[in-house]
Amino acid sequence: MPTSFRFALLTLFAALPVLAQGGGAAAQEPDLIFRKSTTFRLLTPNDKLATYGVDDPVVQNVACHYTLPERGGVAGAFGMAEQVSDVSLSCQQVGPVTFKEKFAQGDVVFQQSRSLFFKKVQIVRGCDEKRNVLVYLIYSDKLVDGSPKNSTSAVPLTPWGAAGDPPKCADWLKK
């Protein structure tokens, strides 16, 4: 094998973990709230459930918390484990809601790579115009083969303190 080909191949494999991190519409890092071990492994990291928090980048004072499994073992220790797709989500209003800009139904709030092989988890937002409720959906998918694992959370827009009437999410939808 020629030296230049070997070097190119080695460089590609070294860059894969960086490429797998992804970017996306919402490039914020989630806040790790806590991890809880679910499977004990003697010499390698345990399997865990991890709970994270993220703020909606467009809707001020709405926060989402999600929990997903993180594989341990040898493959998990080196970031090579195929992560399972199970996810759960809870979003809530944490202050008076204000919108920074208009948004479309299904806009990405947050996304993150979950494996070396193009699986990602993402949170998207919608607006139930009739009920004035923001609806958040988290799901995990692969580049080729999607996943039915998902969870939904609804945030009714309510008055906060002396702020008066809450904004109507329908007024902020791109049409």
State the predicted function of each range.
Residues M1-T11:
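Bacterial N-terminal signal peptides that target proteins for export
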Residues L10-A14, P45:
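An N-terminal low-complexity intrinsically disordered segment enriched in acidic/polar residues
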Residues L16-G24:
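C-terminal segment of classical bacterial N-terminal signal peptides
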Residues A27-S88:
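N-terminal secretory signal peptides
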Residues P30, T98-K175:
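Low-complexity intrinsically disordered segments
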Residues V54-D56, P69, V94-P96, D141, ...:
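Generic structural motif
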Residues N61-D128:
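Mature extracytoplasmic domains of secretory-pathway proteins
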